[in-house]
Swiss-Prot record:
Quaternary data: Probably interacts with PlsX.
Membrane-spanning residues: 4-24, 80-100, 114-134, 155-175
Keyword terms: Cell inner membrane, Cell membrane, Lipid biosynthesis, Lipid metabolism, Membrane, Phospholipid biosynthesis, Phospholipid metabolism, Transferase, Transmembrane, Transmembrane helix
Protein's recorded name: Glycerol-3-phosphate acyltransferase
Functional description taken from the UniProt entry: Catalyzes the transfer of an acyl group from acyl-phosphate (acyl-PO(4)) to glycerol-3-phosphate (G3P) to form lysophosphatidic acid (LPA). This enzyme utilizes acyl-phosphate as fatty acyl donor, but not acyl-CoA or acyl-ACP.
Matches recorded under Pfam families: G3P_acyltransf
InterPro entries assigned to the protein according to its UniProt record, in alphabetical order: G3P_acylTferase_PlsY (IPR003811)
MF terms (GO), sorted A to Z: acyl-phosphate glycerol-3-phosphate acyltransferase activity
Topology of this chain in the membrane: Multi-pass membrane protein
């Protein structure tokens, strides 16, 4: 591993550590999403707390946190396996943000953003999977769980060189969804509702 690769891994973690949900809620004068709704600083909970525009901005910036470091590293000629580790670092930053007392989100959007520069076909397939499951179930967490469970198979099929990092990211996201899995198994997970 070169010094450049290490620098990009560190940069990805630091960029991932910027909690878009918390920053946008502060700018909009909204409550801290870690203390409201589901308690998760992600786009779905920001929608619950503040509506469509703050949620879309949160989603956009969470995607960029994964996309920017991987894209930059790709153009710097970093090898595929290490590009995967850079994606993992961005997700770790989102989950354990340095600047926000290590209280972060679930990294679904950040992981998706990390896929686009190196495997856009896979990223589109992941989006289609999430949308299909969400359309049927109206449960955001279930859509995320099904999508991340299928992600390693998609990677092996489309971009096998990224299979190991994708497995790592999928396991991280599954681990962050432990509470959701328990609520789903007990039938207590709430379906998504439009704000009025």
């Amino acid at each position: 591993m070169t010094a450049l690769t290490l620098l990009m891994i560190l940069s990805a973690y630091l960029l991932g550590s910027i909690s878009s949900a918390v920053v946008i809620c502060r700018l909009w004068g909204l409550p801290d999403p870690r203390k409201e709704g589901s308690g998760n600083p992600g786009a779905t909970n920001v929608y619950r707390v503040g509506g469509k525009i703050p949620a879309l901005l949160t989603l956009w910036f969470d995607v960029l946190k994964g996309m920017v470091p991987v894209w930059g590293s790709y153009f710097l000629g970093i090898e595929p396996f290490f590009l995967g580790l850079i994606a993992v670092a961005a997700c770790l930053g989102h989950i354990f943000p340095l600047y926000f007392h290590f209280r972060g989100g679930k990294a679904v959007a950040t992981a998706l953003g990390a896929m686009f520069p190196v495997a856009w076909e896979m990223a589109l397939l992941l989006i289609a999977t999430w949308l299909l499951v969400f359309r049927v179930s109206r449960v955001s967490s279930l859509a995320a769980l099904v999508t991340v469970c299928l992600a390693p198979f998609y990677a092996y099929w489309i971009k096998p060189q990224y299979t190991v990092p994708v497995i790592m990211i999928s396991l991280l996201i599954l681990w962050r969804h432990q509470a959701n899995i328990l609520r789903l198994s007990s039938g207590e997970e709430k379906a998504f509702k439009r704000r009025r």
